[in-house]
Amino acid sequence: MIRRIPNDQGIKMKRWGIVPSLVAVLFASFAWADGDHGAHTPKMAAPFWVWAVGLGVLTVVVLILIRQAKRGTLMSERFRGFSRNARLLLIRSPFSGLSVSLIRLLFNLYLLAVGFDMLFVAKFAAINWTCHGLSVIPSGILSDLFGRRRVFLLAYTGNLLATTAIVFVTDPTWLLILAAVIGLFEGGHAIVGPPFMVEQSRPDERVHLFSLNGGIQVGAASLGNLAAGVLPLAFAALFDIGPESAWARRAALMCGLPIMLLSMIPIYLIREEWRPMNIRRWVEGIENYGRIGMLALTEGLVGLGLGFSAPFFNIFFDQHLKASTAQIGLIFALGSILTAMVTLFVPIVVHRLGRVRTVTFVKLLGIPSLILLGMSYDIVWAGAMYVITILLIGGPFPNKGISDPIYTLFAMEVVKERERGTTNGIMHAFVEFPMGIGAALAGPFMAAGDWQTPYMIGGGIFAVAFILYYLYFVRIDGREPVLQPATAS
């Protein structure tokens, strides 16, 4: 029985009415901004009350989304029956999205403020993504054999310690070593979520569960992005230093560390019922080589394409458009909060078009905005293109696109249960390793001031990836539907 949706359009209109106010705040920041950033002098881009209002509005929106998600009222549906482990994974999502978005937005800008050049930043990103890719396949195999919780806790502890170190270390050699260490540990904890969520949910609730998790995570990322813009201003006022200085950005980065620690607690509380798997049985149980191979090829092309642009979106605004940290944070936050809202409605499209058609259509629709972003010389136009790009294509975690939860769910459902950890590890490896290659190739272009070429190359590779994905998987999606209407409780 399909549940009837209550007539609450007025509430929805009020909810969406927040969006124009966010846009107004964004444009206000541009109007007050100092147009001459030639010397990149640290100045507040707008009166402090503008950023306070923006932070307050986005905080309220994110808290409402998280509160409604926990109560199960989003889209007038009640998400009941989730297991305790699934709920713990959902509880972890806001902490994860908040900490990662804050650190990733600020860290590249922090390196530039310390005095490193563009080529060093590109080298750091390339090493980090490459090592991330190298570690996830072994981590996926280990999670299949010994349990996902154990692998996660060990890897996340190492990642937290190494991330703490890079905030204080300024020696270039040690920074590159730590980039590799963080990448290796990140691969260990990145493989836990999707397989575990599939294992802890029913087929008829998975689309909603994955969309809900993605919406909460990206909603929290919006708060992290805005905090990354506001915190340097706050520390600059507190310590009488420039908001674009290395110390202001370092202090803001330190705020992300305790949030990382909090995101680890829900995984520690998970009660995992795991039986060790015999290695020989595991090898013999891998059967879906064709599907796993096609997922790997798609991810490889996606990673290579995104590597030319996505790891450096913040640098694009900082170096090319001379935007302040506060402006970058507000633009990134707007993209994240809109993604969080729209993601929750994607299951409606999936119900009509199917999973593969929905993912392919959304991804291909975002390619023009990515290319136009690389051609932008105006911060307002670039901000609009960035928001559209994040909505449709996405970026590095946690800035995923609106169709990414469905894409991940489909990948977990077309393979066997014993293959899921390994499949997820292979997908991560094939997206992260090529992303490191793309970042290394894009570095010289960006250092020379050429942003258009890498964005165009990345867009072309991305288009090829999802055309191949559609041609292979559209028939499988048609033969094996898993989307079912939610039953009334």
Predicted ranges, named:
Residues 94, 162, 173-189, 300, ...:
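Hydrophobic core of transmembrane alpha-helices in multi-pass small-molecule transporters
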Residues 40-51, 233-257, 444-462:
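A membrane-interface helix-boundary motif in multi-pass transporters
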Residues 188-201, 400-415:
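Intracellular juxtamembrane helix-capping segments at the cytosolic ends
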Residues 72-130, 293-332:
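Helix-loop boundary and gating motifs at the non-cytosolic
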Residues 136-147, 232, 342-355, 446-447:
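Helix-to-loop junctions at the C-terminal end of transmembrane segments
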Residues 157-170, 365-378:
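C-terminal ends and interior cores of transmembrane alpha-helices
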Residues 61-70, 257-276, 468-473:
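C-terminal membrane-cytosol helix-exit motif in multi-pass small-molecule transporters
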